[in-house]
Amino acid sequence: MPRVMSMPHTKPGSVPSSAAPVSGAAPAEAQPRDERRIGRRALLTGGAVGAGLGAALGLGAALGIPALREASAPAAAEDDFGGETLPCHGAHQAGVVSTPTAHLRYLSYTLKPETDRDAIRRMFRILSGDVEGLTSGAAPLADPEPELAARPSRLTITVGVGPELVNRVDPAKRPAWLGPLPKFSRDRLDGAHDGGDLLLLLQADDPLPLAHATRMLERDLRAFADLAWSQQGFRQARGAEPSGTTMRNLMGQVDGTINPAPKDEDFADLVWVGAADSAAAGGGWLTGGSALVLRRIRMELDTWDQVDRPGREQTIGRTLDDGAPLTGGTEHTPVDFEAKSAIGLPVIPSYAHIRRAHSTDPSERIYRRAANYDEGGESGLLFACFQRDPRTQFIPIQQRLDELDLLNEWVTHTGSAVFAILPGFAPGESLGASLLA
């Protein structure tokens, strides 16, 4: 293992924020003894003395219960986000640029041998109905448990296709980038989470509608495809951090600082396939879609923990506490790659992750949307990125990381897949219509 040179680096500590008080009734210990006794007796005997509903409400008013309920109502409404829905229709599919949710699941399928072009058309028609029902809270047709779909918690379902599905429709429509990535020297792919013909990406803030949607989709796909693999990931729970906070991975790093934003002027050029793109790049039928690269990255956390904090920060090039570059500032301060230490060494080492990932070509950027995983004694990162063309965006970045990123000593790429994310669809239309046209 290359030796990590520890260079002292200190930052002022951050001041913890105060927790907000919880609204609602005071605990029983804080209430007068007589008031507590009356409350218990009234609740236990109200029906026996013939008080009825009206009398019970009157007693509640005397004890101030309605006032307490009114005081807590805003907090309850603020926390009640289970019924939130995100529109599934549009020029682009939902789930790519929407605010990341706390839970997600990738499902990859292998088409059955008999699933031909006509069967694929039927499959997409069924999938479209499922997406519309499950994400809206209305439940799809023949859902035996519609109650589980009633509160979708911002559920989105994003559909992608692999090379074999496109080949069965029309081999001439397959983009040149849609296939396995070139082999990188650090790859240790085990075949358990590689490739696929059809991809479903489900995301939600609540695992219950996520699990229900998974079961409904698997039921409806059974006649067309077999499940090849699934991967489940998570991020911080909603409300655990202020809105817009960059996620942390299980190494403790702030993960995803350098990321284009949907509001950026060049975002569309980086992420969405355009009508002017060549057929080899997916132009035409894939306009409004994107290319997804998914990498399963196992983290060697036990050995990572043995590295001292300055060594870990130099490996990344950022501080662990707030993700600021070692050259100073805050998380989003531009990195000074020319900065030197007092003894003349680069503040950002040549092997640092952020230096290896950095490019002076603004078109060589990707839109990252990662999540953590922790299962079966293994922890790591589900690294996902969307781009217009992996050949000119993800691959050059990964080649530089493969050559000299010291972080490679503690991470191993065990799964890899590339999918074409279908364009969006309108009400009354079906996913995949442009592919099948």
Language-model region placement:
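N-terminal secretory signal peptides
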Residues: 1-38
